[in-house]
A protein has these predicted regions:
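Active-site recognition of the HExxH zinc-binding catalytic motif
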Residues: 74-94, 103, 107, 111
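Post-HExxH zinc-binding segment in Zn-dependent metallohydrolases
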Residues: 98-135
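Pan-zinc metallopeptidase signature
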Residues: 138-194
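Soluble non-cytosolic domains of exported or imported proteins
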Residues: 10-14, 71, 75, 79, ...
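Sec-exported extracytoplasmic/periplasmic mature domains
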Residues: 24, 28, 89, 110-118, ...
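A short glycine/serine-rich beta->alpha loop
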Residues: 69, 91-98
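Auxiliary, metal-adjacent structural segments of Zn-dependent hydrolase domains
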Residues: 1-70
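Extracytoplasmic/secreted proteins, especially bacterial periplasmic and envelope-associated proteins
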Residues: 18, 79, 101, 105-109, ...
């Protein structure tokens, strides 16, 4: 690991430590089997990705960050927060299907952090870019925002029933006592397609 990479990894670790309490406050603690073991840099990759490399501990993961995340402070914060939120309910399966609920939650976390650090203007430009480039993520965020407006504790309640959020079912919504429009619930539980 080069000196430059060591500095970047140290910055990532500081960001993660600083934001973990806020992420857990919003969405609950990580699933009991989840284990984060550090960051690594990849100058070639286009986006952050979780790496599952330990067969004896399938939910143990590293976060591999692209060098391009460091080109912009807003993007860096968004990328780190998104991977931190995913890390609450890591998905090691190769053929894993995420849901609108999961992807919207991930974006929601990033938006909250951007708003706190950089303000409303940065949130607007981030959401506009999302709407133009990857509308499926924008839509997922919108539905999760509806859910959390109705019940700010909804994700925490759901994850108390099913810690791995991508496995949440309609029955879990009922068990968690979450009152939400049926159509919104159905959309949240759909398989996510970007």
């Amino acid at each position: 690991v080069s000196d430059a990479q060591s500095i970047e990894i140290s910055k990532l670790e500081k960001l993660r430590s600083a934001w973990l309490p806020a992420v857990e406050f919003l969405f609950g603690e990580a699933a009991p089997e989840a284990e984060f073991v550090g960051f690594e840099m990849n100058p070639e990759s286009a986006k952050p990705v979780a790496l599952f490399e330990n067969e004896t501990a399938p939910y143990q993961y590293k976060i591999q960050m692209p060098a391009r995340s460091f080109s912009n402070d807003v993007m860096l914060l968004a990328d780190v927060i998104q991977e931190m939120v995913r890390g609450l309910f890591p998905a090691p399966e190769q053929d894993h299907n995420s849901t609108t609920l999961c992807e919207g939650t991930v974006i929601y976390g990033a938006i909250m952090a951007i708003k706190q650090v950089f303000g409303e203007e940065s949130v607007d430009s981030y959401l506009n870019a999302l709407r133009e480039k990857v509308p499926a993520y924008y839509d997922a965020f919108s539905y999760v925002a509806v859910l959390l407006t109705e019940d700010p504790q909804a994700i925490k309640k759901l994850r108390a029933v099913q810690p791995l959020l991508y496995k949440a079912t309609k029955e879990d919504f009922d068990t968690a006592d979450i009152e939400i429009n049926r159509k919104v619930k159905d959309i949240l539980l759909l398989t996510f397609r970007a």
